[in-house]
Curated annotation (Swiss-Prot):
Residues annotated to bind NADPH: W15, H35, Y51, K107, A139, R254, L276, E278
Keywords attached to this entry: Cytoplasm, Lipid biosynthesis, Lipid metabolism, NAD, NADP, Nucleotide-binding, Oxidoreductase, Phospholipid biosynthesis, Phospholipid metabolism
EC number: 1.1.1.94
HAMAP family reported for this sequence: NAD_Glyc3P_dehydrog (MF_00394)
Gene3D superfamilies, sorted: N-(1-d-carboxylethyl)-l-norvaline Dehydrogenase, domain 2, NAD(P)-binding Rossmann-like Domain
Top-level enzyme category: oxidoreductase
Binding site for sn-glycerol 3-phosphate: K107, G135, S137, K190, D243, S253, R254, N255
A biological process from GO: phospholipid biosynthetic process
Recorded GO CC terms: cytosol
NCBIfam families named in the record: PRK00094.1-2 (NF000940), PRK00094.1-4 (NF000942)
Name used for this protein in its record: Glycerol-3-phosphate dehydrogenase [NAD(P)+]
Length: 328
């Protein structure tokens, strides 16, 4: 694949802005597309996102609300929520050139279809090259230029390598992979485990319980991933264990902070605080997919039951602790 000189980022939220900053620091010409008029105005006039205050856009970043303008880039980062990805790609598809890499930067599974992000891209834009970017990374850290490592996966190794090279800068190190499914599974599954870890923290059950929850959550992640064809080394890498470790340890993670609120006794609606916790959408889908493959995922079951109002936090914790003893 030829080198990538221009990158478009669709989505001017915190993560989209951070990735636009990174691409600009890597020497690419960057177009940042924002659908929301208020945030687009803020990005254009103040050179700052409403969702990432205090971070000034790099001079190389051009802000636009014209999707056709963004579609002219050599590669496009799709930094929109998982549940609206299909809508965005469907609008984008007629505007892009053949074999344009479209990189999903959301971690989730589509409701109703059980499709992963790259599968949605392949269906909605069949002439594009689907890819996924995932790993332990908070927008604020990336935007500030703090050291971060992620994984970029595509079916074609040359495409994955070219994308990693295009996004590589002094503080942002992308590893490349061809295990697309493994990278996607890790990102989606850890969201649910982060909610569980947050519940433990919010309930003040202690560091020992949090370590146990995170470790057993990783066991579920590996079980689920291997059942759906992920490579074991991917599960142990940045997009699996790395992302899980980060998101199960800090309120910077929306899923962890959402779980903390549930652990403190807040309702699901109140705990959301108007912010997206992708794990809340993913949990029931993940559970359906696990059952289809006869994969045992008790932590995921507990999270889904809490979210659906089928059990209380204390009852779910009690059920996990009274499961039959077994070999590790």
């Amino acid at each position: 694949m030829t080198s990538i000189s221009s990158i478009a980022v669709l989505g001017g939220g915190a993560w989209g802005t951070a990735l636009a900053q990174t691409a600009a620091r890597a020497g690419r010409a960057v177009t940042l597309w924002e659908h929301d008029a208020t945030n687009a105005q803020q990005l254009q006039s103040a050179r700052e996102s409403l969702y990432l205050p205090g971070v000034t856009l790099e001079p190389a970043i051009k802000v636009t609300r014209d999707l056709a303008e963004a579609a002219r880039a050599d590669a496009i980062l799709l930094v929109v929520p998982a549940q609206v990805l299909r809508q965005v790609v469907t609008s984008l598809a007629p505007l892009i050139g053949a074999q344009t890499p479209l990189i999903a930067c959301a971690k989730g599974i589509e409701h109703g279809t059980h499709k992963f992000m790259t599968e949605i891209i392949a269906e909605a834009a069949p002439n594009a090259l689907p890819a996924i970017l995932s790993g332990p990374s908070f927008a604020a850290d990336v935007a500030r230029g703090l050291p971060t490592a992620v994984t970029i996966a595509a079916a074609d190794a040359a495409v994955a390598q070219a994308l990693a090279q295009a996004m590589n800068c002094g503080s942002f190190r992308p590893y490349h992979s061809t295990d697309v499914r493994g990278v996607e599974l890790g990102g989606a599954t850890k969201n649910v485990m982060a909610i569980a870890a947050g519940i433990v923290e919010g309930r003040k059950l202690g560091a020992s319980a949090l370590a146990a929850m995170t470790t057993r959550g990783f066991v579920e992640l590996v079980r689920f991933g291997t059942a759906y064809g992920a490579r074991i080394e991917t599960m142990h890498g940045l997009s699996g264990l790395g992302d899980l470790t980060m998101c199960c340890s800090t309120p910077q993670s929306r899923n962890f902070s959402f779980g903390m609120a549930l652990g403190r006794g807040e309702s699901v609606a109140t705990a959301a605080h108007g912010k997206l916790a992708e794990g809340a959408f993913t949990a029931p889908v993940l559970l359906e997919m696990a059952r289809a493959k006869h994969v045992e995922m008790p932590i995921s079951e507990a999270v889904a039951a809490i979210l659906e109002g089928q059990t209380t936090v204390d009852a779910a914790i009690g059920a996990l602790l009274t499961r039959p003893l077994k070999a590790e």
